[in-house]
């Protein structure tokens, strides 16, 4: 604040003092101002112009009063009286100025207090409004911040849950990856081992192939030599067969001679036994042999009606009273029973081992009188069983050697494994069964098949351990089932009235 004051009296006194000893200086003829700073307020005093009668200062370096910056210069020859008067006047003015200053200070204090009070009131109202506005804005911002915080917390919770799930999933994936890595390592080790073994096997295989090639070449040479030998043997066999035919003719002639001799002896009644004459007749079967006094099992010669040649057969004199003519026997698989019609017709094998008597001879025997059939069976566990039929005979070749049976008994099943109502005989080259499947080819051997049927004693021979699950083996269904191949079989016949 700047206050401009004119003090006429004070100006007159200063004029009087200034004009007492100096002259008017035309350069200092204008008004002069004196400014005093007190706190925030500044005071400016207007000083009057100097009178023209005042003397000019003889020197500017002489200063009569250091406190009065604008006081006029006096000459050093002023009298002491003037100086004292001037000092007295200055003291009075100084006191007056102090009073004036005190007055101004007191008035300024009250004014400043009023101004400060008004400013404080105005500032308080403004601050209240601003505070209210700030409070409202703060509350709104707080509410928004609370909502944002809630959203952030919810989002944080979801993110934490998702992070936890991702962590669990990552842990599981890491675990699975570790397991798969371990498995891959194991597989790699196994592959390395297998590759090593394969390399070893390839080396061995190569060596074996080389060995087999050498053996093949050797075998080819051997086969060539054996082929030549076989051809030579076939030639020798052909010559031997011719010789055998000659021997057979000689044997027939000898048998005729023997028959003639027997006939002559019979006519003359020349046969002594125990001192009595008995008439000797040719043996029709093993029952005749047994009744003739030969009660030891073995090979005997029997004669057939309407057949030019006798036949060697095996007679069983031990089972169930003896007198049995054996028509089939299997025991060791040494004989192949997969043969054709002609071979089954005339028979094959050795009566002392495995053999088939022949359908033509079986027909000839069973046509003489009534016969019964007994079948002896044994499995690979040593169990024995039998089936027996009270009536047995077969038809001729035109009838395909049809089988006729009656009256089944025995321990090899409550039911008969042979067809009782009649079945034709079939071989691999003569299919007479009631099936389009050709049972003789599938089941092997010649037999009385009826849609294959539950039995085949002329099937394939299987050894122990390989006899299970064999449909084409030696089977008797109601004894060991349809796929069990038996160890041995014997078919034999005896007259019903024995």
Swiss-Prot record:
GO terms for molecular function: identical protein binding; receptor ligand activity; receptor tyrosine kinase binding; signaling receptor binding; vascular endothelial growth factor receptor binding. This is Angiopoietin-1. PANTHER family: FIBRINOGEN ALPHA CHAIN. It comes from Mus musculus (Mouse). Disruption phenotype: Embryonically lethal. Embryos die at about 12.5 dpc, due to important developmental defects of the endocardium and myocardium, plus generalized defects in vascular development. InterPro entries: FIB_ANG-like, Fibrinogen-like_C, Fibrinogen_a/b/g_C_1, Fibrinogen_a/b/g_C_dom, Fibrinogen_CS. Binds and activates TEK/TIE2 receptor by inducing its dimerization and tyrosine phosphorylation. Plays an important role in the regulation of angiogenesis, endothelial cell survival, proliferation, migration, adhesion and cell spreading, reorganization of the actin cytoskeleton, but also maintenance of vascular quiescence. Required for normal angiogenesis and heart development during embryogenesis. After birth, activates or inhibits angiogenesis, depending on the context. Inhibits angiogenesis and promotes vascular stability in quiescent vessels, where endothelial cells have tight contacts. SMART domains: FBG. Homooligomer. Interacts with TEK/TIE2. Interacts with SVEP1/polydom. Interacts with THBD; this interaction significantly inhibits the generation of activated PC and TAFIa/CPB2 by the thrombin/thrombomodulin complex. Residues 277-497 form the Fibrinogen C-terminal domain. It comes from the Eukaryota. One of its GO terms (cellular component) is plasma membrane. GO terms for biological process: angiogenesis; blood coagulation; branching involved in blood vessel morphogenesis; cardiac muscle tissue morphogenesis; cell surface receptor protein tyrosine kinase signaling pathway; cell-substrate adhesion; endocardium morphogenesis; endoderm development. Residues 81-119, 153-261 form a coiled coil. It is found in: Secreted. Residues 1-19 form the signal peptide. Glycans are attached at residues 92, 122, 154, 243, 295. Disulfide bonds join 286-315, 439-452. Keywords: Angiogenesis, Coiled coil, Developmental protein, Differentiation, Disulfide bond, Glycoprotein, Secreted, Signal. The lineage of its organism: Eukaryota, Metazoa, Chordata, Craniata, Vertebrata. The keyword Metal-binding does not apply. Its main location: secreted. Gene3D superfamilies: Gamma Fibrinogen, chain A, domain 1 (3.90.215.10), Gamma-fibrinogen Carboxyl Terminal Fragment, domain 2 (4.10.530.10).
């Amino acid at each position: 604040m700047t206050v401009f004051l004119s003090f006429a009296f004070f100006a007159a006194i200063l004029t009087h003092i200034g004009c007492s000893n100096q002259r008017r200086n035309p350069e200092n003829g204008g008004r002069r101002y004196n400014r005093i700073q007190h706190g925030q307020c500044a005071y400016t005093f207007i000083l009057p112009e100097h009178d023209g009668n005042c003397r000019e200062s003889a020197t500017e370096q002489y200063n009569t009063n250091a406190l009065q910056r604008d006081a006029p210069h006096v000459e050093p020859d002023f009298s002491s009286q003037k100086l004292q008067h001037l000092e007295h006047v200055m003291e009075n003015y100084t006191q007056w100025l102090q009073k004036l200053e005190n007055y101004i200070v007191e008035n300024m204090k009250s004014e400043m207090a009023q101004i400060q009070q008004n400013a404080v009131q105005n500032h308080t109202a403004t601050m209240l409004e601003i505070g209210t506005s700030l409070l409202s804005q703060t509350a709104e911002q707080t509410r928004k911040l609370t909502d944002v915080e809630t959203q952030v917390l919810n989002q944080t919770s979801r993110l934490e849950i998702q992070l936890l799930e991702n962590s669990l999933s990552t842990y599981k994936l890491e675990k699975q990856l570790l397991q798969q890595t371990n498995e891959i390592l194991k597989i790699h080790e196994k592959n390395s081992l297998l590759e090593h073994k394969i390399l070893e096997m390839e080396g061995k295989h190569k060596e074996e192939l080389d060995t087999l090639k050498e053996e093949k070449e050797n075998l080819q040479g051997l086969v060539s030599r054996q082929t030549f030998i076989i051809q030579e043997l076939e030639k020798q066999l052909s010559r031997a067969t011719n010789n055998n035919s000659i021997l057979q003719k000689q044997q027939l002639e000898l048998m005729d001679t023997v028959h003639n001799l027997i006939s002559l002896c019979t006519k003359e009644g020349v046969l002594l036994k125990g001192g009595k004459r008995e008439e000797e007749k040719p043996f029709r079967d093993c029952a005749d042999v047994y009744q003739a006094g030969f009660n030891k099992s073995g090979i005997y010669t029997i004669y057939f009606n309407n057949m030019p040649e006798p036949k060697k057969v095996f007679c069983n004199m031990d089972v169930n009273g003896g007198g049995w003519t054996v028509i089939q026997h299997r025991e060791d698989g040494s004989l192949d029973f997969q043969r054709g019609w002609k071979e089954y017709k005339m028979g094959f094998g050795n009566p002392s081992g495995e053999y088939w008597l022949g359908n033509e001879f079986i027909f000839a025997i069973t046509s003489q009188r009534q016969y019964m059939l007994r079948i002896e069976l044994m499995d690979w566990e040593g169990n024995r069983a039998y089936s027996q039929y009270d009536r047995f005979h077969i038809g001729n070749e035109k009838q395909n050697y049809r089988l006729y049976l009656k009256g089944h008994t025995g321990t090899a099943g409550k039911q008969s494994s042979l067809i009782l109502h009649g079945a034709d005989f079939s071989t691999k080259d003569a299919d007479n069964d009631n099936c389009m499947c050709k049972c003789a080819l599938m089941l092997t051997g010649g037999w009385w098949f009826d849609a294959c049927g539950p039995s085949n004693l002329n099937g394939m021979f299987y050894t122990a351990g390989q006899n299970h699950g064999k449909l084409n083996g030696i089977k008797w269904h109601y004894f060991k089932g349809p796929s069990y191949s038996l160890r041995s079989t014997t078919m034999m016949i005896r007259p019903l009235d024995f």
